[in-house]
A protein has these predicted regions:
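Outer-membrane beta-barrel "beta-signal"
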Residues: 210-215, 247-263
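Residues on the lipid-exposed face of transmembrane beta-strands in outer-membrane beta-barrel proteins
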Residues: 37-41, 59-65, 94-98, 113, ...
Length: 263
């Protein structure tokens, strides 16, 4: 759904004269509301399956002001029960920030505060500060970003190796001029700090998406460099027989397919 708070202008022809009042251009909407709903073959976050390698359903809504400020809500079904990545069955993200072009450089800045909420496992709630820069070069778009989770209760609850976490990433996407509905995208990220999936690791994504009207189909290969050996030695969440294998299974390379409807 997209709501635009604008006033429409009408063209009026006067029969008694040759003058014509032309329709005014619609002004930029003050506020836009957009949303989406998706079905995914599994929910991966920074390379790690958050849905026990099983399908998930997701939805999002964003309210944005034309000045660049925005607030968003995002939700997904997720792992629960005996899964070693147990986040209580549901994840709800709330985040807000500001995005704006930097002068005439062609670079766009985006930054804000991101909260991760797990109603079924509240000890896992945490927040991050985030920032990114992106720029288009013809059919290519390059983006780099940083997410920082400062000292907070999450790190005390799960006794991570440090009381903060840093995530750095870079992305390159390509949309051919003759087929703009197609996007080929790549992503490489690095996690280091208190999130005890492992002391640190890399995650990667290579995929392609195709947009038709309000539908987007995406097929990607997603994975990490977490091996079965460092899964056994890194001090992951969870313990007991098979824990290391289950974490490795959640982190190993897999194909992920999604279908998203935007409104």
């Amino acid at each position: 759904m997209k709501i635009k708070f604008v006033c429409a202008a009408a063209a009026v022809a006067f029969a008694c004269s040759s003058q014509v009042a032309f329709a005014e251009d619609a002004p930029t909407p003050e506020i836009t509301v957009t949303g989406s709903a998706a079905v995914v073959s599994q929910y991966r976050f920074r390379g790690i399956s958050q849905s026990d390698n099983k399908p998930a359903v997701q939805a999002a809504i964003t309210v944005a002001d034309k000045s660049g400020f925005y607030v968003s809500f995002w939700g997904s079904s997720a792992s629960a029960g005996q899964s070693q990545v147990n986040i209580g069955g549901t994840e709800i993200d709330v985040y807000g920030g500001y995005t704006h072009a930097i002068g005439k450089t062609g670079i766009t800045f985006d930054g804000g505060l991101y909260g991760y909420l797990y109603p079924g496992a509240p000890a896992g709630n945490y927040f991050e500060l985030y920032g990114s820069l992106s720029k288009a070069y013809g059919p290519f778009t390059v983006k780099g970003g940083l997410n920082w989770a400062p000292d907070q209760g999450y790190f005390d609850a799960y006794q991570g190796i440090s009381h903060y976490n840093m995530y750095e990433y870079g992305e390159i996407s390509f949309s051919p001029a003759k087929l703009p509905a197609l996007t080929i995208h790549t992503h490489l990220g690095h996690t280091g700090g208190g999130f005890n999936y492992t002391k640190e690791y890399l995650d990667y994504t290579v995929g392609a998406s195709y947009k038709w009207k309000n539908l987007t189909l995406d097929a990607s290969v997603v994975g990490t460099n977490v091996s079965s050996d460092n899964a056994s030695n890194a001090g992951f969440i969870g313990s007991g027989p098979g824990s290391a294998y289950e974490i490795y299974r959640a982190a190993k390379t897999a194909g992920v397919v999604s279908l998203t409807a935007s409104f």
